[in-house]
Amino acid sequence: MHSAANAKQQKHFVLVHGGCLGAWIWYKLKPLLESAGHKVTAVDLSAAGINPRRLDEIHTFRDYSEPLMEVMASIPPDEKVVLLGHSFGGMSLGLAMETYPEKISVAVFMSAMMPDPNHSLTYPFEKYNEKCPADMMLDSQFSTYGNPENPGMSMILGPQFMALKMFQNCSVEDLELAKMLTRPGSLFFQDLAKAKKFSTERYGSVKRAYIFCNEDKSFPVEFQKWFVESVGADKVKEIKEADHMGMLSQPREVCKCLLDISDS
């Protein structure tokens, strides 16, 4: 009886990283959630982390998000997961919400892009460009890749950008780890521009929560709050002294927020 009650209380958290990063960013949060008795799946999206595919093999946003879609497809029909998406990972969360709304108890966006069912999938990026200075990315590098007739745009995070805008509240060890493990990524802007927007009937039916990281210098808190004001969230949390990488600079606070959101 006791074990049955524990099983009922156990939740399954699926963690989705942002662009150029990987499942490794959750190395502090995953054991905290597991020690609280929960199941955790940290996903490496295509051509990210230790996923074996290369960026030049990934042609669409759906290709990029495929590992998350595979996890969602494997979830039993009677189970619901808690999704957590960080940064660009919020867009992959949106795809999972549109495709498998019945398998998600709540989708949590942390310093993340939040798709708007009333606008195109590129709308969040257009607003980011409006609200954030053009030199925000500092020494990050952008270049074309793939088919010369229809090239994609790749992005490599610059060490200065990472140190000053993403990991400024993290330990030097976490910053060094990130410099070693980041990979070229893409925002798949051209593909998203052609994609059908997410629906209010499916994407919009999933309960949403947002976690603000209030010392984020790459996703300023004003931009994060704009998502909540324009798209809406059922629950909102704020983590003080958290930079863009809140799961590394404030892992216990992120864990606490997640447990509170998932319990309500």
UniProtKB/Swiss-Prot annotation:
The catalytic residues are 87, 216, 244
Q: Which reaction is the catalytic activity of this chain?
A: polyneuridine aldehyde + H2O = 16-epivellosimine + methanol + CO2
Its EC number is 3.1.1.78
GO molecular function, a single term: methyl indole-3-acetate esterase activity
One BP annotation, GO: indole alkaloid metabolic process
Upon changing residue 87 to A, the result is: Loss of function
Q: Which InterPro entries match?
A: AB_hydrolase_1, AB_hydrolase_fold, MES/HNL
Provide the residue ranges of the propeptide in this protein: 1-6
Instruction: Give the pathway listed in the UniProt entry for this protein.
Output: Alkaloid biosynthesis; ajmaline biosynthesis
What is the top-level taxon of the source organism?
A: Eukaryota
Question: Where is 16-epivellosimine annotated to bind?
Answer: 87
- Tell me what controls its activity: Inhibited by DEPC and HgCl(2).
What is the applied biotechnology use of this protein, as the UniProt note states? The strictosidine aglycone-producing AJM7-DeltaHYS yeast strain expressing pathway genes of the VOM module, RsGS, SBE (GsSBE, RsSBE1 or RsSBE2), RsPNAE, RsVS and RsVH, accumulates vomilenine. Additionnal expression of pathway genes of the AJM module, RsVR, RsDHVR, AAE (RsAAE1 or RsAAE2) and RsNNMT, leads to the production of ajmaline. Ajmaline is an anti-arrhythmic alkaloid commercially used as an efficient drug for the treatment of arrhythmic heart disorder.
Q: What is the effect of changing residue 20 to A?
A: Loss of function
In this chain the AB hydrolase-1 domain maps to 12-122
Keywords in alphabetical order: Alkaloid metabolism, Hydrolase, Serine esterase
Q: Which consequence is recorded for altering residue 216 to A?
A: Loss of function
Binding partners and assembly: Homodimer; homodimerizes in aqueous solutions at pH 7.0.
What is the protein's known function? Hydrolase involved in the biosynthesis of ajmaline-type monoterpenoid indole alkaloids (MIAs) natural products, important plant-derived pharmaceuticals used in the therapy of heart disorders. Catalyzes the hydrolysis of polyneuridine aldehyde into epi-vellosimine, precursor of vomilenine, an intermediate chemical in the biosynthesis of ajmaline.
Q: Name the family.
A: Belongs to the AB hydrolase superfamily.
Name of the protein: Polyneuridine aldehyde esterase
**Source organism (scientific name):** Rauvolfia serpentina (Serpentine wood)
